[in-house]
A protein has these predicted regions:
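Interaction-mediating elements
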Residues: 21-147
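Bacterial Sec-dependent N-terminal signal peptides
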Residues: 1-24, 33
Length: 147
């Protein structure tokens, strides 16, 4: 019994340490975020080792923004629906071989290279998801499987 209690405590501390932040968010990162998203609410930060990710909301839209360790903006992902994407993207998806699959998630991805892409997640079955990335012109850029 005593061994089980000790084992449980060790597991608890291991899980807690994995979820802990490794370092403080640099001021350059938070200042860059505040300058870019002054009206953001519910901001939470994640340390991704080579970058920092802010999860937040603006006008009830769920967003994620990634910054370098020096505070340079890398990309922003905004949750949306297939109905809210440009007509070209909608048409590109409808013409794809995955159009019959149920759409699980849609993200608008804006990058520092001034390109906007749309990531559509479709669920084939309980064990198989496909991540489809479209250009703003509706061309499928990538098609990845997640098991």
């Amino acid at each position: 019994m005593f061994k089980r209690v000790i084992f449980s405590i060790v597991i608890l501390f291991t899980v807690a340490s994995v979820n802990a932040q490794f370092r403080k968010i640099p001021a350059e990162v938070t200042d860059s975020f505040k300058a870019r998203y002054a009206t953001a609410s519910g901001v939470s930060w994640k340390d991704k080792l080579t970058s920092f990710q802010a999860d937040f909301k603006i006008d009830n839209k769920e967003m994620k923004s990634t910054f370098s360790t020096k505070g340079d903006w890398i990309k922003t992902e905004t949750k949306c629906s297939l109905e809210k994407v440009p007509l070209e993207v909608k048409d590109g998806f409808k013409k794809s071989k995955y159009a019959s699959l149920p759409v699980q998630d849609v993200l608008k991805i804006e990058g520092k290279d001034q390109l906007t892409q749309y990531k559509v997640t479709v669920k084939k079955n309980d064990f198989n998801k496909r991540y489809l990335v479209f250009s703003s012109e509706g061309q499928m850029i990538s098609d990845n499987t997640m098991l």
